[in-house]
């Protein structure tokens, strides 16, 4: 790593630590030429391929925004939404792919959102799965009821 002070082409790693829930690695470095220290941050880039074929970086902020819209007017706090977004990011990063289709991000949102708030889940699913009729909603509600009964909640 090039020293930002003297431009020496090499440096020594003094310390490495994980940051941002393990998504980043912060390295403290020392330059053997001038002796100054500096910090670098490394992050594995995760790209999302949209339906149009356009690729963009994964954004936890976009997840939070979409889930927040689905939760509007519901008793769901910002901390719960942030935790859900973190779970989604961990799930998609665990797949080990550098790129993944936006469809997989949506699927990763549905499970945790269903556990968080069923009404918000229905709102999100209706957009994500392009519900076109009441029958689509009824089918999804029946699936939720069946799952609740299976878990012993109904």
From Swiss-Prot:
Keywords: ATP-binding, DNA-binding, Metal-binding, Nucleotide-binding, Repressor, Transcription, Transcription regulation, Zinc, Zinc-finger. Signal peptide: none annotated. One of its GO terms (biological process) is negative regulation of DNA-templated transcription. A zinc finger (unnamed) spans 3-34. Binds 1 zinc ion. It comes from the Bacteria. Pfam families: ATP-cone (PF03477), Zn_ribbon_NrdR (PF22811). GO terms for molecular function: ATP binding; DNA binding; zinc ion binding. Negatively regulates transcription of bacterial ribonucleotide reductase nrd genes and operons by binding to NrdR-boxes. NCBIfam families: transcriptional regulator NrdR (TIGR00244). This is Transcriptional repressor NrdR. It comes from Salinispora arenicola (strain CNS-205).
């Amino acid at each position: 790593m090039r020293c930002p002070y003297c431009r020496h082409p090499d440096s020594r790693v003094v310390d490495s630590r994980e940051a941002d829930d393990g998504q980043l690695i912060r390295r403290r470095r020392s330059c053997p030429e001038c002796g100054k220290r500096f910090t670098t941050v490394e992050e594995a880039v995760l790209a999302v391929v949209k339906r149009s074929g356009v690729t963009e970086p994964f954004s936890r902020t976009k997840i939070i925004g979409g889930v927040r819209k689905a939760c509007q007017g519901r008793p769901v706090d910002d901390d719960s939404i942030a935790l859900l977004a973190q779970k989604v990011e961990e799930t998609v990063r665990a797949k080990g792919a550098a790129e993944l289709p936006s469809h997989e991000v949506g699927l990763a949102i549905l499970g945790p959102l269903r556990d968080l708030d069923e009404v918000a889940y229905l709102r999100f699913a209706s957009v994500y799965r392009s519900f076109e009729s009441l029958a689509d909603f009824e089918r999804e509600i029946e699936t939720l009821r069946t799952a609740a009964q299976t878990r012993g909640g109904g």
